Amino acid sequence: FNVEKGDKVAVIGDNSLATTAFHQILNGELDATTGDFEFGQTITTAYLPNENEEFFDGTESLMDWLRQYSENKDEMFIRGFLGKMLFSGEEVLKKSDVLSGGEKVRCMLSRMMMASANVLMLDEPTNHLDLETIEALNNSMKTFTGTLMFTSRDHTFTETVANRIVELTPKGFIDSLKSFDEYIVDGGIADQKKALS
């Protein structure tokens, strides 16, 4: 299937390992057993993995943690990106090895925003996040002008952000230009799912 600029694709499926593998393949972390894919020449990507522990094995502050991923080392620049994910004041001096799961996701999202990519791939971005952060993420993804491919078990997030649903099944996939709620109640989709199970 082709993904166009501005598509906000919810990648869904009964098997969360399959949706995670899909994101890992697109991000080059896993080799596909069949098939291939190709990004356009002007595409820049950023990826939020489902698991992020490997990114937080040091004792540096959040400022220093994010600074390592930036060409611009200026404190105000780094603080700005942490601030977008609701880190403020002395919070940016917190050690990265004592962060909660939600704080780690917020750091990873700050890192993604700093990359200024035009294609974002998010694997379960709302995991561990509090309601305020989910709302901030939801609003930023709704207004994001690039392409988004994401997996989320958060119904509201998926319904309000996605303009396209791709469901992975044991025997293929279903690609539908519908909202999540429209997709769920579509009888034709249910028939396709049964045929591909």
PLM region descriptions:
Residues 1-197:
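ABC ATP-binding cassette signature C-motif
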